[in-house]
């Protein structure tokens, strides 16, 4: 009964190893779906030598999002093994003897069943670092959840609409790659491996901080209250303008022929400012606005729809 085998031919082929600050660092991942592979790809881009062991059935992402899977596994050496079998465990531990960082995304209880709890790992591999991606920190790591539930908890969902992207997963991936670098730095200082937990719910809460501070509320300076930091309609689409700093705001006022009152300065929160800019942008095409932005160094981006 074969329990460890090579990856299918459809697996992405390793690309030339990049150079970077993590050159020489060996990372092994047994993490599936999105956060782990995204973190692994970031580490590869920073120069780490990355390897991944998947179950014989493969990573679910390979089946429902083949292009995303391919993008996230460029430069990663992928193999497969059933970690619930003796042969699979042998494959894993052979790889761990040549690993600096192990990346996981299982619940703590599942890791312990596989013999990969931190106590057991650290005893067997004193120099190994582990980055454990979990849903929520501490005991809550055993509670079922996913990107959507963590985003809802962080206040990043509205009404019945689905979010435009996976903030918790991708934020967690960045946090995991950051944790891997911190683990390597600490090991360099102490000579010992260390364990770091990365919770997707914590990543979602971090990304939601501007909202919790009120920055993105309708009354917030980057939530639409500042007339120079909004999305407007133009003749053939939309335009996102981010003239927030005083020098950018002044340039926008100049090109829109909006002058300050004789006494005082322009009030960018006043409704009249939004009306004037609405009229200005409505009179221009995307091409003309792109030209205006280029010639006046304005932070502006046009959209077709």
Where are the regions a protein language model picked out?
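Aromatic-enriched alpha-helical interface/lid elements that frame and gate functional surfaces
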Residues: 227-304
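Short, surface-exposed loop/helix-turn segments at secondary-structure junctions
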Residues: 213-220, 256
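Active-site-adjacent beta-strand anchor residues
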Residues: 29-30, 104, 198, 241-243
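Generic secondary-structure signature for well-ordered alpha-helical cores
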Residues: 182-193, 203, 257, 282
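N-terminal helix-loop segment corresponding to the beta1-alpha1 unit
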Residues: 1-192, 216, 276, 287-288
């Amino acid at each position: 009964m074969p329990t460890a085998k090579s990856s299918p031919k459809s697996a992405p082929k390793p690309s030339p190893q990049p150079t970077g600050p993590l050159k020489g660092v060996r990372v092994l991942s047994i993490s599936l779906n999105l956060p782990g592979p995204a973190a692994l790809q970031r580490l590869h881009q920073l120069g780490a030598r990355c390897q991944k062991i998947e179950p014989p059935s493969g990573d679910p992402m390979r089946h429902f999002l083949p292009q995303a899977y391919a993008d996230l596994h460029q430069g990663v050496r992928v193999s497969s093994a059933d970690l619930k079998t003796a042969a699979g465990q042998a494959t894993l531990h052979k790889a761990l003897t040549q690993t600096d960082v192990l990346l996981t995304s299982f619940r703590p209880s599942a890791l312990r069943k596989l013999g990969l709890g931190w106590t057991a790992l650290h005893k067997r591999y004193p120099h190994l670092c582990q980055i454990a991606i979990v849903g929520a920190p501490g005991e809550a790591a055993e509670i079922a959840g996913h990107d959507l539930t963590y985003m809802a908890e962080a206040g990043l969902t509205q009404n019945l609409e689905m979010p435009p992207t996976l903030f918790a997963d991708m934020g967690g991936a960045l946090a995991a790659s950051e944790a891997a670098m911190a683990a390597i730095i600490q090991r360099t200082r102490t000579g010992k491996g260390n364990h770091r937990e990365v919770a997707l719910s914590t990543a979602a809460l971090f990304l939601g901080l501007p909202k919790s501070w009120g920055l993105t509320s309708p009354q917030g300076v980057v939530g639409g209250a500042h007339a120079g930091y909004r999305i407007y309609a133009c003749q053939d689409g939309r335009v996102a303008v981010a003239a927030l700093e005083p020098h950018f705001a002044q340039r926008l006022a100049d090109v829109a022929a909006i002058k300050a009152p004789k006494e005082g300065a322009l009030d960018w929160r006043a409704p009249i400012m939004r009306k004037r800019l609405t009229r200005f942008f409505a009179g221009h095409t995307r091409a003309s606005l792109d030209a205006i932005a280029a010639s006046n160094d304005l932070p502006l981006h046009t959209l077709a729809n």
